[in-house]
Amino acid sequence: MKKGARGNITKLLQEKLVSLGYNTNGVDGIFGTGTEKAVISFQKNNGLVVDGIVGQNTWRKLLNI
């Protein structure tokens, strides 16, 4: 999932990031700049590849925290 994605799964991502203390600039189901910045911060803080894209490894880490 990357910038431009929309829908319930994006909203779930935003809710999880917010619950972990990351600012997504709202939980609206739209993967915009705020969500991308939050994903990048999460990736940096968790030793993941920093690309702003929520792939398998990023999802796995998010769901296991």
What are these regions (language model features)?
Residues 24, 47-48:
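Alpha-helical hydrophobic/aromatic positions enriched in membrane-embedded helices and signal peptides
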Residues 16-20, 42-46, 65:
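Structured segments of extracytoplasmic/periplasmic soluble domains
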Residues 1, 5, 60-65:
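Intrinsically disordered, low-complexity Ser/Thr-rich linker and spacer segments
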